[in-house]
Amino acid sequence: MLDIGWTELVVIAIVLIIVVGPKDLPPMLRAFGRMTSKMRGMASDFRRQFDEALREADLDDVRKTISDAQSLNPTAALRDAMNPLRQLGNEIKSDLQKATTPDRPPASATPEPLVEPVNTDAVGETAAKATEKVAAAAVSSASRQMDRAADVPKASEPKPAPKPRAQSKKPGTSVTKKAAGETAPKKSPARKAPGEAPAANKSKTRAASRKKGDA
């Protein structure tokens, strides 16, 4: 430990025997052994403390490395690494969409004419007026047709043929009857005046009176 050989130990023992004497040499050797044991204990304690300090230093380093590893977030690193790939994918998608979609014509710069709102009340009023006018015209035309139909005389209708009467003895009366019968249908298609009807009745009464006189 102290780099002392056997010869040196022998020299030291001789010097101690001469100086201390044979009586005091054993207790001195005991004290020397105790001192050496204490020194060895102190050295061992120092080594232990030194080893503990080294271990603590190593543990601190290990703790630092562990804390650094815990502080590191692998997901964030992966996201940072994947961001450029995502950007490239988005750019490729946009290019494909532009290539597939046809080019649209540019919008016309001329603004479209604004359509004014139609007033429904005014339209309804005009429609009602038009229907009223049409109804009034239809009523007036119907009334005119009714008036015209009423103006047509009943004499225009075909009269029933006169019944054959008994032949009289005189030929003159029969001739007059035939003449009257021939003239009557010829005048029927013509429109007679309202004053002709009493004249015909008068002629009939005269003919009847003549027949009675002849009889």
From Swiss-Prot:
Comp. bias (Basic and acidic residues): 145-157
Membrane topology, as annotated: Single-pass membrane protein
One of the protein's GO biological processes: protein transport by the Tat complex
Presence of keyword Calcium: no
Compartment(s) where it occurs, according to its Swiss-Prot or TrEMBL record: Cell inner membrane
MF (Gene Ontology): protein transmembrane transporter activity
Keyword Coiled coil annotated: no
Disulphide-bridged cysteine pairs: none
Keyword terms of this UniProt record: Cell inner membrane, Cell membrane, Membrane, Protein transport, Translocation, Transmembrane, Transmembrane helix, Transport
Compositionally biased tracts (Basic residues): 203-215
Record-annotated membrane-spanning stretches: 1-21
Broad class of where this protein is predominantly found: membrane
Ranges for region Disordered: 95-119, 138-215
A GO cellular-component term linked to this record: TAT protein transport complex
Annotated function: Part of the twin-arginine translocation (Tat) system that transports large folded proteins containing a characteristic twin-arginine motif in their signal peptide across membranes. Together with TatC, TatB is part of a receptor directly interacting with Tat signal peptides. TatB may form an oligomeric binding site that transiently accommodates folded Tat precursor proteins before their translocation.
Oligomeric and partner information: The Tat system comprises two distinct complexes: a TatABC complex, containing multiple copies of TatA, TatB and TatC subunits, and a separate TatA complex, containing only TatA subunits. Substrates initially bind to the TatABC complex, which probably triggers association of the separate TatA complex to form the active translocon.
Family: Belongs to the TatB family.
Protein name: Sec-independent protein translocase protein TatB
